[in-house]
């Protein structure tokens, strides 16, 4: 699940992470935004300090970014942040990476970090993905465009698709491992169960829901679609 990080304090996110581990959730993730999309007046917690706190307070759950944006900090700084997180949570880190897009460009501009051209960002994405992969870190690439999906496929890492239907997952699953992330369906437990089952049938290896999440329902749906069930 994606933690509630658009807050003034980390209290809620830490409580949610603890509840997630207790409930049997496989992983918790954090956005890498300087503010919620289109809402610059609202706060946003930085992902790596928050995930570091989660790592130290948990024993089993994976911790990851969804997604850390290439170019927001120098590549070597980004790699070092994942390295430090891996020390705190060995074997539990998922490095979600992305290039950003027009929707997030305003954040870069506001903080004096104008985004590089798309081809340069994709090249840097490929280098970072390969470096982290070679270190033994699981890497997911946000596949919002065909260009970034090709980078992930070339690097042999996972493609993460945001809020797409199972048919799009199935199409990508023919080319690479694929995970899904998005909001919880608003039509109740039955809709969640149908979505999770559809994603599993399509080949998604993870389904990551954005907070707020009905934990018990989500875990029950995941267990019902697990291999051998």
Predicted segments, located by residue:
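Active-site-adjacent structural elements that line small-molecule/cofactor binding pockets in enzymes
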Residues: 1-229
């Amino acid at each position: 699940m994606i933690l509630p990080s658009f807050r003034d304090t980390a209290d809620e996110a830490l409580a949610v992470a603890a509840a997630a581990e207790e409930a049997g959730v496989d992983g918790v993730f954090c956005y890498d935004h300087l503010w919620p999309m289109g809402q610059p007046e609202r706060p946003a917690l930085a992902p790596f300090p928050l995930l570091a706190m989660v790592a130290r307070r948990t024993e089993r759950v994976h911790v990851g970014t969804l997604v850390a944006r290439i170019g927001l900090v120098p590549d070597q700084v980004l790699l070092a942040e994942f390295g430090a997180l891996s020390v705190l949570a060995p074997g539990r880190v998922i490095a979600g990476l992305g290039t950003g897009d027009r929707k997030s460009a305003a954040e870069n501009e506001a903080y004096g970090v104008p985004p590089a051209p798309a081809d340069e960002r994709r090249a840097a994405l490929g280098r970072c993905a390969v470096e982290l992969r070679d270190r033994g870190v699981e890497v997911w690439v946000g596949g919002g465009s065909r260009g970034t999906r090709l980078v992930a496929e070339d690097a042999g890492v996972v493609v993460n698709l945001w809020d797409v239907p199972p048919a799009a997952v199935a199409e990508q699953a023919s080319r690479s491992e694929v995970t899904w992330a998005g909001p919880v369906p608003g039509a109740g437990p039955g809709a969640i169960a149908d979505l999770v089952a559809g994603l599993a049938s399509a080949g998604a290896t993870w389904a990551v829901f954005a907070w707020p999440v009905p934990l018990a329902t989500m875990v029950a749906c995941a267990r019902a679609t697990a291999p051998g069930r």
